[in-house]
């Protein structure tokens, strides 16, 4: 059984550029990356998740969720990952739940002024209005033995400086101690979770293809795993904000998604 730091596996990435500009002017559907810092027995985390679950399906659909579990609580959460711990430290997270939307801001705790159904929903319109999608992601994944691979293609609609990140999450993890089921659990990071630079910089609308791979742990269910690919864009204030992304199940595929 893989536990602790053994659960987070870092693998290789290759990059190639292609010149296709198909559909480059269509408006991409805007996903919001929701990074959750949590642990298994956190009561307030359950409450926060309840707020999320209470959203309409159309609202929930906007979110790409990654749950970075931490080695906290009694019994101690076994689903922690070393890169999730490092990111928690780097982002100075000290209270649970803490949620990050698009790596822009941290929202701490629950209730008024913190995580609530209303504040979660507001993140969608905030992202669409403040940082509209200028890129989109499509992907195809294969499974070769215990190696999961993904080819992710990004359509960039604007010149600029970008970063890309890829992580592997697992859904439907049933814990026999708490009788709970956990989803979107961070299992492996194929890049720095704050993104690796897209080089050379994007100077005109174009597509580029990126390849990542991860090793599926012995006690993970490959059929419940998915890659989450997210792309940062450098904004006018110098900050890198997640501009868009996609989730692709292992051995599955996902196409570009556009606004209707």
Give the ranges of each region predicted by the language model.
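Short, small-residue-biased leader/transition segments that mark boundaries at the very start
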Residues: 2-9
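C-terminal edge beta-strand
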Residues: 11-19
């Amino acid at each position: 059984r893989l536990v602790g730091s053994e659960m987070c596996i870092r693998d290789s990435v290759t990059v190639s550029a292609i010149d296709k500009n198909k559909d480059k002017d269509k408006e991409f559907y805007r996903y919001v990356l929701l990074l959750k810092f949590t642990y298994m027995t956190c009561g307030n985390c359950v409450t926060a998740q309840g707020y999320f679950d209470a959203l309409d399906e159309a609202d929930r659909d906007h979110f790409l969720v990654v749950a970075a579990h931490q080695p906290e609580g009694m019994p101690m959460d076994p689903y922690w990952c070393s890169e999730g711990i490092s990111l928690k430290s780097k982002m100075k997270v000290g209270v649970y739940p803490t949620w990050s939307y698009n790596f822009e801001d941290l929202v701490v705790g629950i209730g008024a002024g913190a995580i609530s159904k209303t504040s979660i929903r507001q993140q969608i319109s905030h992202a669409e209005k403040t940082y509209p999608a200028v890129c989109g992601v499509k992907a195809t994944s294969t499974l070769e033995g215990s190696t999961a691979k993904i080819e992710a293609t990004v359509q960039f609609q604007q010149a600029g400086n970008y970063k890309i990140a890829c992580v592997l999450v697992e859904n439907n993890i049933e814990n026999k101690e708490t009788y709970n089921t956990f989803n979107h659990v961070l299992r492996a990071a194929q890049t720095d979770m704050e993104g690796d630079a897209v080089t050379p910089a994007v100077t005109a609308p174009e597509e580029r293809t990126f390849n990542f791979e991860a090793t599926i742990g012995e006690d993970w269910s490959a059929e419940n795993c998915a890659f989450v690919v997210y792309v940062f864009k450098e904004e006018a204030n110098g900050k890198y904000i997640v501009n868009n992304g996609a989730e692709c199940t292992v051995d599955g595929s996902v196409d570009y998604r556009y606004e209707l």
